[in-house]
């Protein structure tokens, strides 16, 4: 079986889809399943609303191949209701896809509620991070004077949690905490140090020097930034929204209000709650994709 990924992968700081597909490409290559020539492909994997003209062309040229659609969203929930990309995804899934991969059950259910016509063949495969880059320290971090907090977001959309980060910037006790942010922010922080967009290698290093990762993104289907932080061994605290509860299975680390977050932070600081991370590795996720593709081909 040969797999062709319909996506232009970039080696620079960019969104989670690009990062995950780069990792998946390496996994397919390691398993000798990857092809760079569409003429050799048994399976075409395409992503969300990206490169649909290419997908349409390949579908016409290679009608015997199977086309698998990896879906996130709904984008109308984490962007705004005028976002037309969901309709492009739904059209592509109905027109081109022989099967669908959802990134979380939350994403699957919300897309179906908002108009996606279900594909008869589908599965849910959660994302993972590249463990060559995102891995924990061998020795636990020694105690420092301040607890190091970290957040990241490639997108600067307000629903990525910036109102909440702004609240923390103004209200946290920065005698106890230091706080770093990586990515693009619409907020000019006073106390939080904005590192800007970082390459994966540098981001992973920054994560490993931190203690607690915080995400307040709303309606995020399967947050790659959260998975990267967990993979680096951080204790992670997340807004109870989107696919976060499927990634952080211990609800002691999920919050809905500012006061709940502060309570969780205090419990972590006092060692009253301890998080045990259960993140899958790229080999497992790659094998899940390959097994699903093999089922489609039989």
Where is each model-derived feature located?
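Acidic anion/phosphate-binding donor-loop and adjacent secondary structure
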Residues: 79-80, 112, 127-145
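A short, active-site helix/loop in glycosyltransferases that binds the activated sugar's phosphate group
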Residues: 95-120, 129
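Conserved donor-binding/catalytic core segment of Leloir-type glycosyltransferases
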Residues: 140-160, 166-170
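Short hydrophobic beta-strand element within catalytic cores of glycosyltransferases
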Residues: 235-238
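A charged, aromatic-enriched C-terminal amphipathic alpha-helix characteristic of glycosyltransferases
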Residues: 270-298
